[in-house]
Amino acid sequence: MNITEFEQRILDQKPVESGHYDSEYFTGDWRAEGNNYNLETRRQIEAKNPFLIRDVFQPKKVLDLGCGPGALMHLLWELGVNVEGIDFAESSRQLATPQVRDRITVGYVGDLGIKPANAYDLVICREVLEHLTVLQVKQTVANMVRMTSKFIYVTTRFHPNPSNLLDFTTQFDVDPTHITLLNKDMLRLMFVLEGCRSRPDLEARMDWGNKGRVLVLEKIASQP
């Protein structure tokens, strides 16, 4: 993909409307292998992830950006982690457990006014960026760096075989809202240009499933 093709693809992208993410999206039978957002289902899928988040990052205050119905938030809450969430869909609050419902703010993940700067020592953004346009990904990366004081932990779907740095694709066979699968190096570059450094040591600890979908970044202290 050359720069002209990249530009046109970006201009052609259309954001997914928040109303698409209703209860059917999160809990419907369309999800492969029962991969829905019921709490006990997520508990099995998450396995040791909540414990790793607590132990690897040792956070005092966590933001789950694009938290969905808050299943990971609930599992972290059970471990005594102080966690808040942001999600685009009103259904996320409705489907969340009572323990975390009031900790979820409904809003756009790229909104620079939604939370204060440096308010969290860990910002989590998992399985979110593939649902955004490339321009929205750029905005969301900047917002994550703004809101964290230390670490960012990201998982997303990446282009399985990019031709170059600019190349991105879709994954409609898995989810019709998977509109952006970036080159992994492109996403890392976005964070580096916002003033972060990669933490491959922490990525290795968090990617215990060896899926190759984890990024961990540390904000450089001099960044505002």
Spans of model-derived segments:
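Short catalytic micro-motifs in class I SAM-dependent methyltransferases
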Residues: 126-131
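Helix-to-beta-strand junctions that scaffold the AdoMet/dcAdoMet cofactor pocket
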Residues: 132-133, 148-149
